[in-house]
């Protein structure tokens, strides 16, 4: 499929209800309102196509940008490419669910994510922490440096309260994900989560959201899900 065909298909798959939901979460026009599940047939037909992904991402259409992440060749993209995509990621859904997800399948994932975490920019920091969440939820524990992750937990504990709202959300999710998916530090994550306590995240045009990583990890313990790993992160 070529660019025009994909855009026509995405438009036909759009739903007004989904569009309203995306708009309420920070997406802006142009967009069609396509659910991720509706994209799967096209994903199977196209598989991986980096050139097409670049065309779609550059369109500025939210649904096209999302689908670009689905068909992107994660390891063909350089650090500069990921930075360019982040420059265009205008909302958390693109930063955390498109760019971070794609980066998490690249060999340079941790290297790039570390720089984003240190950037001081809300969505870049959020995407950096989110990249680690996607990595931890998929890769075996021996693919990570335990000391590094331990230091990152300490960083979250000491700095989370002073971060921008979306960064705060992703840092909290990092603690939860370590607790759920990284057995060597699961107990430490629980302790850190308890020290952090409840977080109230302010959201534009929405009621504040209350997060509690400690309670969430405890629920996973009760469900005997500690050590959970997923096979895929992209739809």
Label the model's feature ranges.
Residues 1-235:
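Alpha-helical scaffold domains
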